[in-house]
Amino acid sequence: MSAVAYELLSTTAVISTVFQFLSGAMICRKYIQKKSTGDSSGVPFICGFLSCSFWLRYGVLTEEQSIVLVNIIGSTLFLIYTLIYYVFTVNKRAFVRQFAFVLAVLIAVVVVYTNRLADQRDEMIRITGIFCCIVTVCFFAAPLATLLHVIRAKNSESLPLPLIATSFLVSLQWLIYGILISDSFIQIPNFLGCLLSMLQLSLFVVYPPRSYSGQGYKLVEQAVPF
């Protein structure tokens, strides 16, 4: 692949991912309008912040500027979403505990553990990459309960088709990017992201929506951080 095509792929992947991250802004806008988070969970925001923070660390270690850029933006956005959720949730104490746990994990792994391997750069990259994959794969598990509901109901109207299609394209872009730079830690989670998106898209064929609403997912839960 030519340098121009490579730059085009990395640039479009970053732009697509940022637009995907911005889906959380629509959720937060509703919180602000209603002055309440209702019964929605703040966990996706916290997980998004954790995932982007890990990938930011990984990008810095591997000196991949595209990874660094997209995750600086992602971690900033998810931190803002987290703060907005905190302002409007009634269960602040539980939410603070969840966020404190995530910060503890982030500090323990990124700051303490990996810095002990400062003289073993390859091992530090490997360990950070493993944590990135684990967090991202766990984030992929968020929509699975809805998929089971769709299968039981034999109706895909609760799935947001445009967002799923976008997720597939974003995962595919990063998968190709990971293949080009021979990075299995980028390839693996995005390969799984492609599979999950294709599974969801196939449900529209197997179980056609009786009346499409596309509101079954909270948008941010589908915006898998990378």
Swiss-Prot record:
Task: Offer an example of a GO molecular function term for this protein.
Answer: sugar transmembrane transporter activity
GO (cellular component) term, any one = Golgi membrane
Q: Where is the MtN3/slv domain?
A: 8-92, 129-210
Q: Which Pfam families match?
A: MtN3_slv
Q: Gene3D superfamilies, alphabetically?
A: 1.20.1280.290
Q: Which UniProt keywords apply?
A: Cell membrane, Golgi apparatus, Membrane, Repeat, Sugar transport, Transmembrane, Transmembrane helix, Transport
The name of this protein is Sugar transporter SWEET1
Organism from which the protein derives = Drosophila pseudoobscura pseudoobscura
Family from the record: Belongs to the SWEET sugar transporter family.
Which purpose does this protein serve, as stated in its record?
Answer: Mediates both low-affinity uptake and efflux of sugar across the membrane.
Q: Where in the cell?
A: Golgi apparatus membrane; Cell membrane
What gene does the UniProt entry assign to this protein?
slv
Membrane topology, from the record: Multi-pass membrane protein
Q: Kindly indicate whether the keyword Repeat belongs to this entry.
A: yes
State the superkingdom: Eukaryota
Single GO biological process annotation from the record: salivary gland development
Entry-linked InterPro entries: SWEET, SWEET_rpt
Parts of the chain that traverse the membrane? 8-28, 42-62, 67-87, 94-114, 127-147, 161-181, 185-205
